Amino acid sequence: MKKELLTLFCVAGISFPALGGTYNIAPKARATASSSLNADGDASKVNDGYIRLDNAGEWVSAAQMPYWQQLPYPWIRLDWDEEVTLSRIVLYDRPTGDAHTAGGDLFFSDGTRIGVVGIPDNGEPKVVEFAPKRVRWVKFEVNDAVGSHVGLSEIEAFPPAGAGGDFVSQVNPFIETTKGRYFFFITGNQPFGMIGAAPLTRNRNQYGGGYNYNSTEVLGFPQIHNWVLAGLTLMPTTGNVDPTLGEGHWKSHFRHEGEIAQPGYHRLFLEDYGIWVEQTATDRTGFYRLTFTRDAEAGILLNLGGYLASTTMCNARVRRVGEHEIEGSFDTYGRHWGGPENVRVYFVVRFDRPFDRLDGWAGTRRYSGIDSLEGSSEITRRHPREALSYLDSPTSGVAAHYGVRTGDRIHVRTAVSYVSTENARENLTHDATTWDFDAVRRAAQDEWNEWLGRIEVKGGTQQQRTKFYTDLWHVLLGRHKIDDVNGEYPDLTDGQRAGSFTRDIRVKTRTLPRDAEGRVVHHMYNSDAFWLTQWNLNVLWGLGWPEMPDEMSASLIRYADNGGLIPRGPCAGGYTYIMSGCPATPLIVSAYNKGLMRKCDPMHAFRTMQRNHMPGGMQGIGEFYLEHGYQPKNAGMTIESNFQDWALAQMAGRLGLEDEAAYFGNRSH
């Protein structure tokens, strides 16, 4: 079902050196060159996807510098079978210091030419941007160089946003990353998927936390970007890295030139380690392709201890399972905005290549050649006098070590569960049916195109369309499945409330019901609070993704079946008590009033909300409100409670419950 939305929103013109949205179409072209030194350096290497490798995967011309120092400058050309639209070319010189392609000219089949100067001599990208061109070929002629056998490591060619004809290419994930929260930017995530991975550049929760475009360093790649829940940071390295010194030591510089970020895909280059990191995802797994550009001793770190954006990891338990797999768990504490005091995360990490050895660390101690590890259990309050202080814990984790050669690739898959290690492995096995990274990326982005394409806009400027589809992408982030592929999920509602936290939790494992075809009736979700979503999210979901109000309603009612209360912002099967009132009521009522409620019984949903609108329920009202109709000294909460009562009255009326409709209708005035 497609909807055409006629109103578009404007965005100021901002240029991003990194690529958001569009695809590199150079691999679809045929490469020819004036000369090649040998078969290992022929023209086909210039668009093979191997970039910045030491003396490999590159076009090397046969041009020899004569004694009179006038090099016969070479050229290379890309031809497409049909006309394409281009707006950006990225050139990578050979990383070797013996030959430097310093400048040249780009010639296009439309008769235009663009001069290129200042190409870095270490393989760093040189970005050339221009007004969109319709062309059949592009040719780069060297006009300034040093040394013999100059060439290029790679040429990438990108169309402008929207030219790809899909919806993913309309999204620019970099927009507003300096303002958002930790889970505002998730490129390794499917719509409402369980795994949510992205590079971490600012280790804080709000005001530009998570991935921040203004950052110049990558701290790692966390696999969980949830509302008050984070964890399992992966970080590839090379050389001698002391992990006990933490992310401030193992971090790496990166550049936006050469970076690509899209829904379902992210690529960047770790400058300090010479590693290309590519990331995609399935519903319940993260997937990485690591390309090493030089011979090195490599370590793939898994950090399982310390503060991470919205929570603090500790009590790690890790076990090696053969030479391709690691399993374990860690606890998470310190949710700044409340929630279950402890959420245990189980994980499995699988490698396509056997690691040479597994090392570990806990606090300041390092271990070599281990089969298991117990991390630090120490927790300290960062600000002892603040009730909502973040917590700290020593870093702990393991590192899988490899001896790698130039051009080697290692693939890594991750999966989590909030129930058991066995379930995490089942999630991984169910989703990880191939090591073909490109196939998984295509499937991930096909799914994003289907979701984003539910609302198709026409007209306006490209900037307006980019802003619109980027906003749609954000609407589909921040809420994640917590149930496993077998239907099990954690119930953390049974405990003692302490302010905004739940302590002394009696953890239960529950199983979702299935329909006649064996599919779970609905999923359970971790979600940011639904406070004020009646003005935006409830309406937009109902228009574009009508299954989601139904899904969320069923999930919220099941939370109440487990713990009595309808959550405001559920966390891993428990409550956060964030904000005020019962903001789920307008969402659930809207699903019913629009005829979308299929996955839970409407009468049961109404009675559950009715209980939550009485003293002791999530609405948080007392006898004063029942007697006087307002919240003392709080006009805002009065309006909120009145609106929620009015919404509940509408559902009661449609259900034929005249007394209840009159009661809540009167309460709303």
Q: Model-derived features: where do they sit?
A:
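Short strand-edge motifs at loop-to-beta-strand transitions and within beta-strands
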Residues: 76, 124-128, 398
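Extracellular beta-strand elements of beta-rich domains used
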Residues: 89, 155-157
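Accessory carbohydrate-recognition regions in carbohydrate-active enzymes
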Residues: 161-586, 593-639, 643-669
